[in-house]
Design a protein with these regions (language model features):
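Loop-rich catalytic cores of soluble enzymes, especially ATP-dependent carboxylate-amine ligases
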Residues: 8-10, 105-106, 116-134, 138, ...
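ATP-binding N-terminal substructure of ATP-dependent carboxylate-amine bond-forming enzymes
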Residues: 414-482, 486-489, 508
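Terminal catalytic/cofactor-binding subdomain
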Residues: 1-129, 136-138, 175
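A long amphipathic alpha-helix within ATP-dependent nucleotide-binding catalytic cores
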Residues: 247-259, 301-304, 308, 553, ...
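A short glycine-rich, hydrophobically flanked beta-strand micro-motif that places a catalytic Asp/Glu
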Residues: 96-102, 317-323, 561-565, 572, ...
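Active-site nucleotide/adenylate-binding loops and adjacent lid/helix of ATP-dependent enzymes
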Residues: 463-469, 473-623, 673-677
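Sequence termini and other peripheral, non-core segments
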Residues: 1-37, 41-54, 323, 327-438, ...
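C-terminal active-site "lid" helix and adjoining low-complexity regulatory extension at the edge
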Residues: 634, 658-671, 685-689, 698-754
């Protein structure tokens, strides 16, 4: 089968960069002194029997982070960043993720085999420990997975003389594997990052520093007698089967190679069902990167893989791969600043890269990547191992690694309410994604702008929008809650108290109502908006001018407006989920407190500098505005934004206390009388709501409530209620909501938590 020169035949407009990617990252858990953590795998990470994203490798303290399939290298790194964030915040706060491939100083007896449920997996790890030793098992790395794009493969297939797609793909991936092993030394030279081993790691003295112990025969490799041919797929499959039959290997996965064929459960299935993708297993962790691999490395490797396809396959495969192994060993164990040996043929690599970039018209970015490769070939100072040299102290990188680990740990806990890499999404959705990853529920973002997610476990699929809009609420329930008039009628029919008032569809109608309310405390609000938009509250009778302004503000948000009686008391938000109150929040209206020096405008700016405050529901607290509503509120109190408040003087900028309009959040779940929680849950149930925010005005929360004597008034029901404000509060312990959403949607996962 002719596979050589196929890329050269493709049209320049062919989708040469089309591919799917996945990353697996191993990392040890250590304490703040850089010693191995002896705690079990975190129970909050769910059952390892099915977790798709966070597993343990050989050791109980060796985490393995696995991304979903991504359509770009950028997306793969984004996935890995989020999973790393979840892992970093799921382990103990006193634990860190070790950023090096080589472990800290360890003793063999410290290493505990992963405590897995699967009996074979436990037996397999004990077997490996006995055969290869335990310390080698603590070496960690990155596995880079790539599947050539469907359209790219089809274009290559059309240029070939083949009629069998499976056979063609097998030949294509076999050629790529052959050339990858032939030129494996390129990866070791450019990206090797294991220059030293900590004291007593090896039983014998070894010269150091080197480029990569992990990628040499000092790393985790098979016994020398295990020699598997890549000359053909049949040879590969048969050789491994023979070693297993003879007892030299216990399982197919015990054959360790820098590249592994993937996509089938057993190797022999590759012959008739085909190779789906390749796993490249020889990447050291890059300690300069929080997630262990940089964007430029991901893209450079992608370009190199295409160059390996551009190059012809070796004529004598076994001989070429043996030479490639010997060269890789020499380069791996050479000093990081030692130039490449003469037998390292860099010219054919750089020529292939140049021709590839030129043929397909790749732009400045990829041309820059090629230049970086050329620069590194010419000067080893540009390699990763060389960059680590200044950080080696007394033949150790332990201090450097611990410093990096602490830095990355602190980053994980900075803005800990957000999911790293997904900060532009709505905050409740970020929190739900965090919990989904933590619990081991598969996720796909169907529409990032619309906050629309697909979640699944095995065959069970759920769709979630905006964090808590699910199939559990029928279509009409959010529509009813969006219409405040309908909400009031349903609650009234169910016997629950609501404010008296009327509805208007024009400014003229609203103004005509003024004589009836001119001496009353009132609330003016849009009929069908959420998040406190367009609401004005008058605790003192409103002038006609101010009343008109309030109507105009409300009509700017909706075509219909409600004017209701103002109910005195304290407003609380009750979060109801599936008929149960899960959280109660006291919300304090947007405010500033004077210091006798700064204007109200300056005080607002100071308060907005709080890192918990942001915009568009992506932070636990919202930025405080100084718009029409706030300035009207100031006018009613006799102030302007440029007035200086006396020290200790508190001024509210809003009557309504919504967090979404700059208010502060106080969690009172534990102190709120259960009777009010039950009453709020009953109100949500009367609407048929699964997830619902119930706003109650309570004059005296020390008086127990009942349906007959509620001692409160429901001023609003909210569909798609915010969840973040209950979890990350200005005061109080906070209540986790998103995890309970997932437990309700996937009870089978909740019951499998470790």
């Amino acid at each position: 089968m002719t596979i050589n020169q196929l890329l050269q035949k493709l049209e320049p407009t062919s989708p040469i960069l089309q591919a799917n990617f996945g990353i697996e990252r191993e990392s040890l858990r250590v304490d703040r002194q850089g010693k191995l953590a002896h705690t079990p795998h975190p129970s909050c990470l769910g059952a390892r029997s099915f977790h798709p994203y966070i597993q343990t490798d050989f050791c109980e303290f060796q985490m393995e982070l696995i991304t979903p399939v991504a359509k770009s290298t950028t997306e793969a790194r984004r996935f890995l960043g989020a999973i790393t964030d979840v892992a970093g915040r799921s382990i103990s706060k006193d634990e860190l993720l070790w950023p090096l491939s080589m472990p800290p100083r360890i003793k063999a007896q410290e290493i505990q085999v992963a405590q897995l449920e699967n009996e074979f997996e436990r037996h397999y790890r004990n077997y490996l420990a006995e055969k290869y030793g335990t310390k080698l098992q603590a070496i960690s790395g990155i596995h880079y997975n790539m599947e050539l794009g469907k359209d790219l493969v089809e274009a290559l297939f059309k240029e070939s003389d083949q009629t069998d797609m499976i056979a063609f793909k097998n030949a294509l991936y076999l050629k790529l594997a052959q050339n990858y092993l032939r030129y494996r030394w390129v990866i070791t030279y450019l990206f090797g990052a294991a220059p030293v081993a900590e004291q007593d790691f090896f039983d014998q003295e070894v010269p150091e520093p080197v480029r990569s112990f992990r990628n040499s025969d000092h790393g985790y490799v098979n016994k020398e007698e295990i020699q598997v041919s890549f000359a053909s797929l049949e040879d590969y499959v048969s050789a491994i089967e023979n070693y297993i039959e003879q007892g030299d290997l216990i399982a197919e996965k015990e054959f360790y190679s820098a590249v592994r064929f993937r996509g089938q459960k057993v190797n022999r299935s590759f012959l008739d069902k085909g190779i789906t993708y390749l796993e490249f297993r020889n990447f050291d962790l890059n300690p300069f990167e929080r997630i262990g691999i940089s964007q430029t490395t991901m893209d450079t490797v992608h370009l190199l893989l295409l160059a390996f396809l551009w190059l012809d396959a070796p004529e004598n495969v076994d001989q070429a791969l043996a030479q490639g192994h010997a060269l890789n060993e020499k380069i791996a164990l050479s000093h990081p600043l030692e130039p490449l040996p003469s037998e390292a043929e860099t010219q054919n690599i750089t020529t292939a890269l140049d021709q590839l970039v030129q043929h397909f018209g790749l732009g400045d970015y990829h041309q820059g990547l090629v230049k970086q490769v050329k620069d590194a070939f010419a000067d080893p100072n540009h390699t990763l191992a060389a960059q680590l040299l200044p950080h080696i102290k007394d033949k150790s990188l332990a201090d450097f690694a611990l410093d990096k680990a602490l830095t990355y740990h602190d980053y994980d806990w900075t803005a800990h309410y957000a999911l790293k890499g997904y900060e532009e999404m709505e905050l409740s959705t970020q929190m739900l994604l965090f919990d989904a990853i933590q619990k081991g529920i598969h996720f796909e973002i169907l529409d990032e702008q619309d906050q629309f997610l697909k979640l699944w476990h095995k065959d069970h699929v759920e769709y979630v929008k905006n964090g808590n809009m699910t199939s559990k609420d029928n279509y009409v329930v959010p529509l009813a809650m969006a219409n405040k008039t309908v909400t009031k009628k349903i609650l009234t029919d169910a016997g629950f108290p609501v404010p008296a008032g009327d509805e208007f569809t024009s400014l003229e109608q609203g103004l005509a109502y003024y004589p009836l309310i001119k001496d009353k405390q009132i609330v003016v609000k849009p009929k069908s908006t959420n998040f406190g938009l367009g609401i004005s509250i008058f605790q003192e009778p409103a002038s006609l001018d101010n009343y008109k302004k309030a109507l105009e503000i409300a009509f700017a948000e909706d075509t219909a407006v409600l004017v209701e009686e103002f109910i005195s008391g304290t407003e609380y938000r009750f979060f109801i989920l599936d008929g149960r109150c899960e959280a109660v929040l006291l919300r304090v209206a947007a405010n500033v407190v004077g210091d006798g020096k700064h204007t109200i405008r300056e005080l607002v700016a100071q308060k907005n500098a709080n890192p918990l405050r942001g915009r568009d529901h992506r932070s636990p607290l919202e930025i405080i505005a100084l718009g029409d509503i706030e300035q009207l509120m100031l006018t009613q109190q006799g102030y302007t934004p440029d007035d200086i408040l006396p020290e200790g003087k508190k001024v509210n900028l809003r009557r309504n206390s919504n967090i979404s309009t700059g208010g502060d959040s106080i969690d009172v779940t534990e102190t709120m009388d259960s009777s009010y929680q039950e009453l709020a849950a009953a109100m949500a149930t009367s609407m048929g709501a699964w997830a619902c925010g119930v706003d109650l005005i309570i004059p005296d929360e020390t008086q127990p409530a009942s349906k007959e004597n509620p001692h409160c008034t429901c001023i609003e029901l909210n569909f798609n209620p915010s969840m973040y404000m209950h979890t990350y509060c200005a005061e109080g312990p906070g209540q986790a909501i998103t995890s309970k959403i997932l437990d309700k949607l996937f009870p089978e996962v909740a019951t499998n938590q470790n």
